Amino acid sequence: MESLNGCVLSQLRQSGAQLTRTLQKVQSRSYSAPVSGSIPAAKKKYVPTSGTYPLGFSASGINVGVKPKNTTKPDVCLVASDRPCAAAAVFTKNKFQAAPVTFSRSLLQKKGNQGIQGVVVNSGCANAVTGKGGLEDAGKMAQAADECFGQSESTLVMSTGVIGQRLPIEKITSNIPRAHKAMGSSHDHWLTAAKAICTTDTFPKLISRSFKLPSSPSVEYRIAGMTKGAGMIHPNMATLLGIIATDAPVSSTVLPAVLKHAVDRSFNSITIDGDTSTNDTVALLANGAAGGKEVVANTPDYDAFQTVLTDFSTDLAKLIVRDGEGATKFVTIRVVEAASEEAARKIASTIARSPLVKTALYGKDANWGRILCATGYSLVSEPGLPVNDIPEVVPEKTNVSFIPTDGTAELKLLVNGEPEQVDEARAAEILELEDLEILVRLGTGDKQATYWTCDYSHEYITINGDYRT
């Protein structure tokens, strides 16, 4: 009896400890999604209530229970055109590329960036580091969608979630016809699809807009896109998925180049935590349903579409930063007067992913020394290699400032290598803002680069410590 009582008491203690951890988790979720799964009040403003979607495209999101505990959230998404599209995609550079990355890259190469009908996506399982079986599973997802479209070899595949686990493939493929039947072109259809690709995201990321091209001023073109990502985000793509669709008639011969240009200046210019995922994919589909002249290289239409796509991709990428796990601030890092764009990007990237800079921002601490430190080591050679000269950074020419987003004057922290007498009260006011900019002037050239990042809060640890539980 004593042994039984001891066992019961032990179980009660464990239950009590678990309850305490759960309550602490609930109380700590100030910025990430509440345990209830609702969108935090501060993030609701980023979720559109209407949209303008490209002709000929439809979307859906359904729940199939990729994760057994998920019985309500959509976790399989379809986005497709009613006609074949020109298509391009940019993928992760991580050497452990997930099966859907390998599959989709191979398909685009085989099809010459033409004849793609749609994209099928699952969340909840990354299908990464899953061997030959994982690649077969990606193919089965594509085949199930192809059969719905009445096509063959026409579907790109994306997956996101936990690495190293096989997909419940029969559960997914048997429900893809249901996802196809649920497709529609309304705002609600697109928004549900955007929800289906989310993992630790606190809100669905969806943008749409219309635009015009010089050769067809009377034609209204449309572009829409969804993305996901909140952690494991760093350039060269990260746990970041993006699907962009347009009804403009963009040639398959130029689509890869315009997408790469746009991604380099948007998705590859954000960082949450410096980790690059196995699954990153941003795909662009153009079906030409709106008509007009085909967009080809070396034309005003090409330049105009490039600008539209880059601006659009930048706005999508910024939503990822705003949803950084546990983030309380959206921070623009701008490096100007650099000797080269490469140097500017490297320095901006280093500052943006510095844990010391990010925690200081969370703590509202104007510790500019951390910014300067990151600037100083950003171009230094790796340990074991000869020490390199770094003419791109000259201490006595370097300036650092906080730029408030409320229109007030910049706060200079370092001027030509000399520290300013910082007004701590003014610095605190700037660091209270949800949006702010760090400006670094190098004084060694005329090139520049911009990165977007967020702060690190206690919540980042909570989310990632609990990720698989």
Swiss-Prot record:
Entry GO CC: mitochondrial matrix
Domain of life from the UniProt record: Eukaryota
Signal sequence extent: none
Naturally occurring in which organism (per UniProt): Sordaria macrospora (strain ATCC MYA-333 / DSM 997 / K(L3346) / K-hell)
Catalytic reaction annotation: N(2)-acetyl-L-ornithine + L-glutamate = N-acetyl-L-glutamate + L-ornithine; L-glutamate + acetyl-CoA = N-acetyl-L-glutamate + CoA + H(+)
Keywords: Acyltransferase, Amino-acid biosynthesis, Arginine biosynthesis, Autocatalytic cleavage, Mitochondrion, Multifunctional enzyme, Transferase
Post-translational modification: The alpha and beta chains are autoproteolytically processed from a single precursor protein within the mitochondrion.
Name this protein carries in UniProt: Arginine biosynthesis bifunctional protein ArgJ, mitochondrial
